[in-house]
């Protein structure tokens, strides 16, 4: 017992020295997590040996030590990957490389420049939720590290990586819990992003986005959304800019010109006209694409199976999948969010249903 106690004391002393030094270089942060990893291993061994207390501290369960050790190993490996990237010489604090920040949304990414995003439900200042978006998000992939910028729109918080829009928080998830009308507005960076009441939460259309622009790195990390108390709600004198998404009800035109048509003068006057997207390509590719589109059901109204023109060559392996939308805004959101393979041809237009 004396030997394992002495080793644990030595490791914890080194950890305290790092806390007191408060260094901001990456090698120091890697060393910190190596020591935490050793601490987990010693506590795990102590529990296996039957000790309930060691160095005047309670020895955690085997499962607790094992779970934390796995998280620490993953974090240490990510830091070592980061140390091989162009961001290795940047300033990195204990807080920025903490397990809490590593695991908060978006999880398993390093993050800097946090900014609070407040979502107000039902136009009620007492019914709000606070989230943290990040000006810098460092995505670790195998042996590479990519920095992206956190963005906000009416749908939620996201970043763009490899030309793909990746949402890491959907506001509608909490709207289902806290909103009676399923409507909300987003307050961020002196702006308010709102959506017309004519568009429901499952038919959210394209909105303006707000980039995170702040140098405040000292904000405490938030691993989850924070429910704001009514007493914390105060009015500020700072002017707010409202950003509205397009409202189809405000469009008085009864006819729209169809796109990708030979006859450019043709107009569609039926009230049952729906925006569509034709996806044309090899049948097997379309089948895979249809499977990949299932998680994006909120971005379209319906999707057909793979079909063919009867006049086409019967030996052709190409097919067509038709996707319909409620509004043109929803169509544009679909095209801006979903990553379509370059082998698939995209055509937009309108169809009478």
From Swiss-Prot:
Transmembrane segments: none
Entries under InterPro entries matching the protein: E2/EBNA1_C_sf, Nucleotide-bd_a/b_plait_sf, Papillomavirus_E2_C, PPV_E2_N, Reg_prot_E2, Regulatory_protein_E2_N, Regulatory_protein_E2_N_1, Regulatory_protein_E2_N_2
Keywords assigned: Activator, DNA replication, DNA-binding, Early protein, Host nucleus, Isopeptide bond, Phosphoprotein, Repressor, Transcription, Transcription regulation, Ubl conjugation
Region (DNA-binding domain): 273-353
Free-text description of this protein's post-translational modifications in UniProt: Phosphorylated. Sumoylation plays a regulatory role in E2 transcriptional activity.
Compartments in which it is found: Host nucleus
Any one GO biological process: DNA replication
Cross-link Glycyl lysine isopeptide (Lys-Gly) (interchain with G-Cter in SUMO) residue location(s): 280
Entry's Gene Ontology molecular function annotations: DNA binding; DNA-binding transcription factor activity; nucleotide binding
Disulfide bonds listed in the record: none
Residue ranges, annotated region (Disordered): 206-234
Compositionally biased intervals (Polar residues): 206-215
Transactivation domain as annotated region, ranges: 1-200
Pfam families: PPV_E2_C (PF00511), PPV_E2_N (PF00508)
Cellular-component GO terms for this entry: host cell nucleus
The protein's assembly and partners: Binds DNA as homodimer. Interacts with protein E1; this interaction greatly increases E1 DNA-binding activity. Interacts with protein L1; this interaction enhances E2-dependent replication and transcription activation. Interacts with protein L2; this interaction inhibits E2 transcriptional activity but not DNA replication function E2. Interacts with protein E7; this interaction inhibits E7 oncogenic activity. Interacts with host TAF1; this interaction modulates E2-dependent transcriptional regulation. Interacts with host BRD4; this interaction mediates E2 transcriptional activation function.
Task of the protein: Plays a role in the initiation of viral DNA replication. A dimer of E2 interacts with a dimer of E1 in order to improve specificity of E1 DNA binding activity. Once the complex recognizes and binds DNA at specific sites, the E2 dimer is removed from DNA. E2 also regulates viral transcription through binding to the E2RE response element (5'-ACCNNNNNNGGT-3') present in multiple copies in the regulatory regions of the viral genome. Activates or represses transcription depending on E2RE's position with regards to proximal promoter elements including the TATA-box.
The family this protein is said to belong to: Belongs to the papillomaviridae E2 protein family.
Name recorded for this polypeptide: Regulatory protein E2
Gene: E2
């Amino acid at each position: 017992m004396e030997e394992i106690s002495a080793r644990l004391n030595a490791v914890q002393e080194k950890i305290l020295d790092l806390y007191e030094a408060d260094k901001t270089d990456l090698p120091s942060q890697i060393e910190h997590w190596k020591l935490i990893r050793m601490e987990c291993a010693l506590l795990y061994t102590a529990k296996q040996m039957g000790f309930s207390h060691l160095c005047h501290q309670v020895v955690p369960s085997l499962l607790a030590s094992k779970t934390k050790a796995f998280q620490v190993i993953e974090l240490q490996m990510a830091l070592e990957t980061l140390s091989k990237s162009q961001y290795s010489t940047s300033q990195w604090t204990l807080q920025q490389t903490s397990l809490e920040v590593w695991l908060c949304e978006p999880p398993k990414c390093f993050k800097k420049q946090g900014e609070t995003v407040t979502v107000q439900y039902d136009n009620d200042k007492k019914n709000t939720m606070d989230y943290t978006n990040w000006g810098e998000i460092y995505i670790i992939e195998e042996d590479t590290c990519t920095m992206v910028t956190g963005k906000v729109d009416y749908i939620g918080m996201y970043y763009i990586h490899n030309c793909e829009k990746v949402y890491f928080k959907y506001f509608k998830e909490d709207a289902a819990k806290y909103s009676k009308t399923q409507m909300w507005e987003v307050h961020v960076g002196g702006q308010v992003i709102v959506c017309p009441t004519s568009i429901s939460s499952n038919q959210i259309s394209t909105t303006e986005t707000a980039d995170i622009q702040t140098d405040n790195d000292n904000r405490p990390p938030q691993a989850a959304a924070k429910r704001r108390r009514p007493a914390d709600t105060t009015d500020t004198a700072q002017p707010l800019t409202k950003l509205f998404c397009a409202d189809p009800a405000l469009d008085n035109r009864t006819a729209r010109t169809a796109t990708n048509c030979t006859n450019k003068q043709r107009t569609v006057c039926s009230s049952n006209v729906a925006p569509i997207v034709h996806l044309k390509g090899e049948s097997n590719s379309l089948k895979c694409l249809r499977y990949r589109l299932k998680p994006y059901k909120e971005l379209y109204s319906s999707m057909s199976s793979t079909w063919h023109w009867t006049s086409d060559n019967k030996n052709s392996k190409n097919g067509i999948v038709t996707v319909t939308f409620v509004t043109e805004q929803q169509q544009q959101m679909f095209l801006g969010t979903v990553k379509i393979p370059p082998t698939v041809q995209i055509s937009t237009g309108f169809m009478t249903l």
